[in-house]
Amino acid sequence: MIAGIAFAVLFAAALLTVPTLPGIDKPGYDIVSHVNEHSGAMRMQSLLVTFGSLALVVVLGYARDRLTGPPGYVFTIGSAVVLVEVFIATWFTAGLALHPDQLGSATARTITDIASMWGPILTVADIMVAVPILLAANDGRFPRWLGILAAVFAVEQLIETITIIGPPASFISPGGAMNFYLGGPLFIVFFLALGVALSMEQPAEVQE
């Protein structure tokens, strides 16, 4: 599905456009320096995420059409939460870049701390989306390979919840390496795969 590919390209570009914000162990003036250096790229990143989210909505909508019963309702709620969390996080990160020359250290540190909790909390919404896909794949509504990927994604996200309480300057710190370098790419791969699977014909026995 074109929407899945568009989502993956846009989100991957957004992920690579700007280096990660200084971690929770860094002082506010490091964040101010980062924002001043990358303010234009941060706003471009927000634009890429915005258009990527539109493509993601299409993927989620078509996926929901193949789900039934309670898993379908859970998927709907999870999809909505994913999108809301993405937009809220984007508000904060893009907002930092609007007036970089007027940004104070304390303000920068506070806003970045809030944005840093996006990845850790997003894990729960991702599980709410991945598990219904896994169940549907077991019922033959999606290819088995997608079910395996959904299981891997759900388990990884469950483990990644540890970043909610992870210590500073560690792999599992909030908004740190685990969220950005492991969870982020896997998030993109899963929804790309979901879009690809949706472009494939359903087995005849599960078609309505």
Locations of the language-model features?
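Hydrophobic, aromatic-enriched alpha-helical segments typical of multi-pass transmembrane helices
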Residues: 1-208
